[in-house]
Amino acid sequence: MKAKHWYDYLWVYAIIYFALGFSNILFAWLGMIDFLLPLFLAIFGGNKFFCNHLCGRGQLFSKLGTDLKCSRCKPTPRWMSSKWFRYGFLIFFLTMFGNMVFQTYLVAAGATSLREAIKLFWTFRVPWGWTYTAGTVTDWVAQFSFGFYSLMLTSLLLGLIVMVLYMPRTWCAFCPMGTMTQGICKLKNKE
């Protein structure tokens, strides 16, 4: 049996992150760890250590799909791991992230007001006001939280859907962070 490490339990972090965001939207900022740490490790380590060992979301999909048998364990369609789909999804994802940052800027500039809602699948507006008390922080900080949590929750739901339909970690085949870190590693290894 393989020895367990502390990082084998980071799937708990994924659950805690989403639970905290459900109770207080400002905890959404913790998700920046999942954005910055993989890039930092790829740039300075030249590998995908985060994806292979530290990704709580990937571990959660493994737990649910394999250990709890929530996955059909069907082969992942090849197009989901194809270069055109992965980079296309990355571009789409970064566009949505850029739009979220722009909306945050508009709130900070006073051009629009705070929207106390999250958007699932970048389309469906879900009231989420109970998670924030107006005036706790400046409006732009709260706006970023709502937008970022929307992005994180949508990607979790997409990951759960493909986990149920295919292999437990199908999300990892086209995860935007995985695609970016893979690109960074390829560039670093050419040096």
Walk through the language-model features, giving the residues of each.
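Non-ligating segments of multi-cofactor redox enzymes
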Residues: 1-191
